[in-house]
Every structure is written in C-alpha cells, then in structure tokens.
Amino acid sequence: MKKISFIAASITLLATTGTADDTTRPNVIVIYTDDQGYGDATCLNKNAKFSTPNIDRLAHEGVLFTDGHCSDTVCTPSRYGLLTGRYSWRTELKRGVFQAERPCLIPDQRMTLASLLRDNGYQTAMVGKWHLGMDFPGTRTTRDWSQPVLDMPLDKGFDYFWGIPASMNYGVLAWFEGRFAKVPPTEYTSKKPNKIALDDYRIMPPYDQSASVKDANAAGNFSGKLEVAPDFSDISCLDRFTTQSIEWMKKRNIDKPFFLYLPYTSPHKPVIPMDRFRGQGQAGAYGEFMIETDWHVGRILDFLEKEGLDENTFILFTSDNGPETTWKKRKELFQHASNGPYREGKRSIYEGGHRVPFIVRWPNGITSPGRTYSSPVCQTDLLATLADMVGAELPKDAGEDSQSFLPALTKAATVNRVPMIHHSSRGEFAIRDTQWKLVMGSTKKRNQELYDLSNDPGETTNLIEKQTERAQALRQKLTHIVRSGRSTKGNAVPNDTPYWDDLFWMTEAEYQQPDRTVQSVEKKTKIHRLASTRRSVFDAFSYINRLPEAPYEDESSEDFSGRIFGRLANQEGRILLKSPPGMS
C-alpha cells in the first residue's frame, strides 16, 4: 500500500503540457507496407513492370536509402523492431510470427515510437494492421464483445487505434476502433479461392454462422474457420485505412504535432486490387495491387499538401520484409524482380529477405533532397532518430539497437553505423559490418558464409575460406552484441530469455547475461481477465506491480524517480484514476 500511496500522490504532480515549439515540430508519418520487396518500386527498380509515381515522389523529394533494412524477415518481429528500436530475438519470439490472439510482444512499459512522441507533446494514432498480439475477451467459442480488447495499441503509447489485429490468415477479422469492434466478428469463414493471384486466397462474404472448432494447441494455433465480422471484406482494407487516417488527421488538435503509424496490408496476401486498378501494369494482380498501394500513398500526400502540412511532415516509407515466395513465379511469368538484384525474399537471411524500400521525405528538415544514401540503416534506428529530432534522451532501457540517422537527413552526412544484426524467420543470424556480412547458417547445417556486399551484392561468392580472420572477428562482434543486450553504446542489459539453440556458435557459458538489480522493466506479466473483478481495478494493480521497485546499480535516486515519473506520465494517470485508455 505504501507503493500505491506514493504513486497516487505522485500523479497529482503530473501534467501533460505542450512546449513552445509544438507548432514547429515536424509531424511524423510512418507508412509500413507488408511484404513489399526492394524491387517493387520504380525508384529502386528501373525494370519494374509497374509504376509507383507517389513512392517515387517521396524519393525525389527526400532521401532514398538504398541499403535500408527491416530488423527481421517476417511480420511480427519486424514490427517490434520498428516500434521499439530493439531486435525482437532478444524477446521470447525466436522464430516465426504471432497469431492474432496472444499477449502482446511489447510490454506496456517499454518505450515505443508512440510513447516517445506522446511524452514529447505529440498526439498519436495507429491505423492499419497490428500483428503484435492482443488480448480478446473470452475464447473463440465464448466471446463477449461487449468487453474491451486489452494489451493492444492503446496500451503502447497510441491515443487512437483503428485497424485489424493481424494478417488476414489469422482471423479475428473486424474493423476495430479503440478497444471495441465496430461490428463484432461473430461469424466464421474458410479461406476462399483467389482466382486472379498466384497461390492465394480471399476473405470475403458469404460467411457462416457456426464453425467446427478444435482446441487450440500450446502454440496458439487452431484448426477450423476464422472469426470474421459480417461487414469485413479483404478488398476494403487499403481504402478504409487511408480514409480513416485522413479523417483522424482532419480531427487532430491543430496546436499539437501528430504521429501517424499507417501499416498497410499490401502487397501481402490476399492480393486483391480494387476493380479500378485491374489491367494496369504488366505484373498481374500483384502489380495492380502495388499500383493501388501507391495510389493510396498519393492520397496521403495530397491531403498533406491541401492542408499545408506537407513541408513540415517527416514521412518514412518502408516495408516489414522482402517479397513473398511468389516472387519466383512473377519473375518467370512477368520478368518482374520483386527482390531487385538481391538473393531470395521473405523469411530468408539473405539480402532479399531484409533489404527493403526505405525512403524519408521531410522538406523542412532534409538537406539536398532528391539524393541517395548508400550506407546501411535499419528500421530499429527510427526511435533514436525521432528522439534526436525532438531533443529527447532515450532511457537506458529503450532503443538498445537504435542509432540515429538524423545527420544523414539534416546534414547530408554519412553515419558510421554500428554492426547490424540480421535474423531470419527460421532463427538464423547474420552480422553486417561495413560491406562485410557473415551468415551463421541454420542450427542443423551450421554452414557459415562470408560475403563482400560491395563487390557481391547478390551474395554469390562465399569468402569464408579466404577470409578466416575477418570471419572470426565478425563472430566475436556478433557474440558481444547478443550477450550484451544491446548493439549501441551503453551499459550491458539482459535479454528477455536464457540461452537458446540458435546461438550454436557460442556456449551457454559464453552467453552469460549481465546482472541487473531490477529486471521488472521487461517482466512480462499477462493481465488475465477475471469475471469477478472490475477491469480498471485489476489493471491498475497489475500496472503498479510492473513498475520499477529499485534503482539500477549505477542509477541515482533522481534518475530513478524520473524513470517512475516517466512511466506514469506515459499512462497520463489513467491507469489509477479511471479505466484504461479507450474504456469508459
């Protein structure tokens, strides 16, 4: 009770206030496509079989990063890396992706792009696909959609959420606004054939009133039909997401800067362009879908220009991973290379799996727009970049793998990035340091490969036998980055888990983690729903119990107090004084 009294008293001292330069700080928009390969934009692929004029406009009026990377090679881990500035393999997620329903990979107390900017006077919104886990009321057969969704974007720094929980193949498909579905997903569907695309499916009416449901297994998978709302249709996603984003921006507080995270569902399956785009381009339905995606990007740009917001809005356009395996058939049928000149695609440890479009447009901030930046940059770097931009200092337990690339924008300077770690959906590791890339191989094969990307971007010539000392040095750097809990400067911090098999090149003893007095910052406490307990009360005590209880070994009492106040300010007092955000 002493701790609760202290926190309750502290809340009276907290207030969210704007700063004198709120009206001059840039707005921030992150447009995040799904499975778009490096070669799926004409500014990166002059031989593309379709045109992307609006994406190209971002490049012509901004900076085109030709060596930009996502932090993993599939949806969930890349999204974690983008939002937190930390590699997802440091968490419990070592391989693959999440289902729609499970505890969120981001703990409430971990800093995100949204919480960073909200704490610095921004209004924050997410519109689109989440795919980091949510806590839905009940189970597939016992849903109570009058109850709120928990452990979701509103708990991770976003003031507003409108979108879907995950990829469409994982179900629970409805248009969610805040913590509630606009129309609950009370019907069921199987995947229907998609006759216009390669190896694809559809999610569209008619839907069923019941489904044959089998028990979920330990991994959270299930057999049976997907939960879906009567008004949901796959073909509507891009249009609805763009329209809702524009509506939110129209209703924003014009006296405060805003942050919009817009993760689209394209060109991920189902590949289903609207009729108006059929017949365009020369790459089948996939090309038409990319043309539609580009058109929606243009809608955002047109709105910003109309409202006089385009000059002072920082836009990052990028993708969560390389292209789906259908890239091989597209190359054969249409001579379109979704992976550009790079090896393989989605899920792969090679460049085609994680080198993606990466473009920043910010007229008021970029020096010499229209240029190309050829040094490495990672999506994890966005957190440190935005912190740098707003003049904020990242705490010790945030952005462990994030390095600011702001000088590359504002000064046209080259940033000497620390070694970058790549990670595949199968748990494989690689390390990139300058032009050198060491691929560690799979747990089974353990066939290490070394490539000189400056002379061999297609990763065709393995130099491991000729460059043994260089390979050994890279292995040592990789080991250090893994076990230190961070790749950027700062004291070592622990990862979230003990040793795992994918770290086969080091022993369990070598993995020994740094000690820290308090590890409650990353303690993952699932908030269970209790029928006899009011959600607001239970959430309040659960949140308090996850606050830091003591300072780090090298942390002053002032810094410790500031860390607690920062956590509470991020919640704006709502967790104790009333229901969680989005609940009445």
Where are the language model's segments positioned?
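Metal-dependent active-site segment of extracytoplasmic phospho-/sulfohydrolases and closely related
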Residues: P257-F258, P263, E292-R330
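Short, solvent-exposed turn/loop segments enriched in Gly/Ser/Thr/Pro and often Arg
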Residues: L44-A48, L64-R86, M126-G138, I164-N169, ...
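Loop/turn elements at helix/coil->beta-strand transitions in domains of secreted/extracellular proteins
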Residues: T24-I29, E61-T66, D119-A125, K156-D159, ...
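A short beta-strand-to-alpha-helix junction
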Residues: N47-T52, H69-V74, A100-M111, K191-P193, ...
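Long, internal low-complexity/basic segments
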Residues: D21-P26, T33, G37-Y38, L64, ...
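Active-site segment of extracytoplasmic enzymes that catalyze sulfate/phosphate-ester chemistry
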Residues: V30, G37-M126, L132-D144, F158, ...
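Active-site His/acidic residue clusters
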Residues: G171-V172, F176-A181, Y188, N221, ...
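C-terminal cap/loop subdomain of S1 sulfatases and analogous C-terminal strand-loop tails that border
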Residues: T139-T142, S146-M168, V183-P184, P323-E351, ...
